[in-house]
Amino acid sequence: MPRTQRNDNFIDKTFTVMADIILKILPANQKAKEAFVYYRDGMSAQADGEYAEALDNYYEALKLEEDPNDRSYILYNIGIIHASNGDQEKALEYYNQSVDLNPRMPSALNNIAVIYHYQGEKAREEGREEEAEALYDKAAEYWKQAIRLAPNNYIEAQNWLKVTGRSEMDVFF
């Protein structure tokens, strides 16, 4: 039974009914509709913390989805799961694939920056100052891109950029 048929709460059931109606009237081919069902089930599993099930659904969606923008969101969600599981390198791989398909995705750019910043912190703790600075610079570049796309978001990143002297702008928003 598909995950979306197992939802217990009213909001999930309502969303599922609405999504099913939209799928029926959406002028999309069958393959795209199937991809959406897998994506929707992946999001539901991910929200429930069922990461293995979510990944299975996302991988199936990737096999079917052809639209680059839609693929970027699938890849982004796969990246989130890998980051949640502590696999930063794999998360970076998927976030970068997502940005390659959709360079206007500030959340993916932010997540890439967060990982580089974290890696910079670890390098600094281990006394690898040059490596830390290089990682911080990478984080700064990704945060600047994210902030340009969503100037009212990422306030902590904006402050960090200012405090560390990595900001060329006085005000982002």
UniProtKB/Swiss-Prot annotation:
Q: Which cell locations does it reside in?
A: Cellular thylakoid membrane
Source domain of life: Bacteria
Q: Name one GO cellular component term.
A: plasma membrane-derived thylakoid membrane
Topologically, how does it sit relative to the membrane? Peripheral membrane protein
Q: Where are the TPR repeats?
A: 35-68, 72-105, 120-153
| Subcellular location, principal | membrane
One Pfam family assigned to this protein is TPR_12
Annotated TM spans: none
Note the InterPro entries from the entry. PSI_Ycf3_assembly, TPR-like_helical_dom_sf, TPR_rpt, Ycf3/AcsC/BcsC/TPR_MFPF
Keyword Repeat annotated: yes
Which parts of the chain are coiled coil?
none
Which keywords are on file for this protein? Membrane, Photosynthesis, Repeat, Thylakoid, TPR repeat
The biological processes this protein is annotated with in GO are: photosynthesis
**What family, per the record?**
Belongs to the Ycf3 family.
Function per UniProt: Essential for the assembly of the photosystem I (PSI) complex. May act as a chaperone-like factor to guide the assembly of the PSI subunits.
Q: Name the NCBIfam families on file.
A: PRK02603.1 (NF002725)
Question: What name does the UniProt record give this protein?
Answer: Photosystem I assembly protein Ycf3
Q: Which organism is it from?
A: Rippkaea orientalis (strain PCC 8801 / RF-1) (Cyanothece sp. (strain PCC 8801))
The gene name on file is ycf3
